[in-house]
UniProtKB/Swiss-Prot annotation:
Its EC number is 7.1.2.2. Produces ATP from ADP in the presence of a proton gradient across the membrane. The catalytic sites are hosted primarily by the beta subunits. This is ATP synthase subunit beta 1. PROSITE patterns: ATPASE_ALPHA_BETA (PS00152).
């Protein structure tokens, strides 16, 4: 194996000089023995000429110095895949960080792989029921599709994702991969213990677990956060290629972009709009195109997307939009009214909300709900200035129903039971459609609107109304 030496260190970016005849390829993994710090892995990003390569460190570069010997492995970063990864927490390099011994994998895959070709891809469309009323009604998910949860800080992306993991992963009993990209370590910890309680992680017999976890948290260097999503995706691809249906949860895709921004300037690239890397669209495309279903199995991905300053036109969320089949937009305005989940039914969209896919009845009910809410939104200014009395009878009725619908779109979550004390409710799609159909038809006009708050199907509302 060829050896070189470090010639420059700037934060997470390290330049290494090799003999001219043995320069490493782009994406090759290099190893540095940093004595007391252990072995550090570098990933080649650029060849600068003169035998010098520019690399990103997959760990902290503290303790490195010029002149240290670097070894070329002649291979890209490879991570464990297969059954051995289930029930384990790993870092970007696939090393265990849960203090439960070695992974003991039978096979390793390189994290950089080609996306499946057109011939291999599957184009079947079937619905994935989530048990969350507003999602199943307004922005239904596709099995094998890509779903984005968009929202600013503190409006409930992670809680919604946890509920989806609880409802889909536990109900659908398939395998899941959870990639924590640049999120809080506490959330990763909470998730691990919740999965143990739910029986999804089995510590006695890890091979019976249903989820593999890969974490590159907020405190990690940018190299880890930039590559950890690829590590999780590689593990999911292996399960898919074995003919399984996999769920891939990524929290948060924005931090993946941000890590690219952090190293982009150090790699000598000119920043583009808002300081993002010029390769933003390409980096996002490389990741998203690999998340796809083939004829052998499917990957359904749910990605949380942080929206900086609640601005959906920011280049990072705007680039992500283009790749998704369903977008769930969380609204700070709805959250401020105390209506949770704070999903905006007018902003959220889905490719699956099509009469040919969900059926004419579902489509009509969803559009009916949206048009009522839109009418209420238009009338809000008039109500604020002149009051309800100035509205026509039709408009008064529309406002009354819209307010009931707004409240009926709320729902107690299983994962929020700890803070709210209300037991979570899973609402089947047929119950959701039946309930909203009755609401639109005016069957429940005589029921007070507070009875609609935090209920499951319409039977719960009628039960609650009796107690009021």
């Amino acid at each position: 194996m060829a050896t070189g030496k470090i010639v420059q260190i700037i934060g997470a970016v390290v330049d290494v000089e090799f003999p001219q005849d043995s320069v490493p390829k782009v994406y090759d993994a290099l190893k540095v023995d940093a004595k007391e710090k252990g072995t550090l892995v570098l990933e080649v990003q650029q060849q600068l000429g003169g035998g010098v390569v520019r690399c990103i460190a997959m760990g902290t570069s503290d303790g490195l110095r010029r002149g240290l010997s670097v070894e070329n492995t002649d291979r890209p970063i490879e991570v464990p895949v297969g059954i051995a990864t289930l029930g384990r927490i790993m870092n970007v390099l696939g090393e265990p960080i849960d203090e439960c011994g070695e992974i003991g994998e039978e096979q390793r895959y390189a994290i950089h792989r080609e996306a499946p070709s057109y011939e291999e891809q599957s184009n079947e469309t079937s619905l994935l029921e989530t048990g969350v009323k507003v999602i199943d009604l307004i922005c239904p998910f596709a099995k094998g599709g890509k779903i984005g949860l968009f929202g600013g800080a503190g409006v409930g992306k992670t809680v919604n994702m946890m509920e989806l993991i609880n409802n889909i992963a536990l109900q659908h009993s398939g395998l899941s991969v959870f990639a924590g990209v640049g999120e809080r370590t506490r959330e990763g910890n909470d998730f691990y213990f919740e999965m143990q309680e739910a029986g999804v992680v089995n510590l006695e017999n890890p091979s019976e677990s249903k989820v593999a976890m890969v974490y590159g948290q907020m405190n990690e260097p940018p190299g880890n956060r930039l590559r950890v999503a690829l590590t999780g995706l590689t593990m999911a691809e292996r399960f898919r290629d074995e003919g399984r249906d996999v769920l891939l949860f990524i929290d948060n895709i924005y931090r993946y972009t941000l890590a690219g921004t952090e190293v982009s300037a150090l790699l000598g690239r000119m920043p583009s709009a808002v300081g993002y890397q010029p390769t933003l669209a390409e980096e996002m495309g490389v990741l998203q195109e690999r998340i796809t279903s083939t004829k052998s199995g499917s990957i359904t991905s749910v990605q949380a997307v942080y929206v900086p300053a609640d601005d959906l036109t920011d280049p990072s969320p705007a680039t992500t939009f283009a790749h998704l089949d369903a977008t769930v937009v969380l609204s700070r305005q709805i959250a401020s009214l105390g209506l949770y989940p704070a999903i905006d039914p007018l902003d959220s969209t889905s490719r699956m909300l099509d009469p040919l896919v969900v059926g004419q009845e579902h489509y009509d009910i969803a559009r009916g709900v949206q048009s009522l809410l839109q009418r209420y939104k238009e009338l809000k200014d008039i109500i604020a200035i002149l009051g309800m009395d100035e509205l026509s009878e039709n408009d008064k009725q529309a406002v009354s129903r819209a307010r009931k619908i707004e409240r009926f779109l709320t729902q107690p979550y299983h994962v929020a039971e700890v803070f709210t004390g209300d037991p979570g409710i899973y609402v089947a799609l047929k119950d959701t459609l039946r309930s909203f159909k009755g609401l639109l038809a005016g069957e429940y006009d005589d029921i007070p609107e507070q009875a609609f708050m935090y209920c499951g199907a319409i039977e719960d509302v009628l039960e609650k109304a009796k107690k009021l």
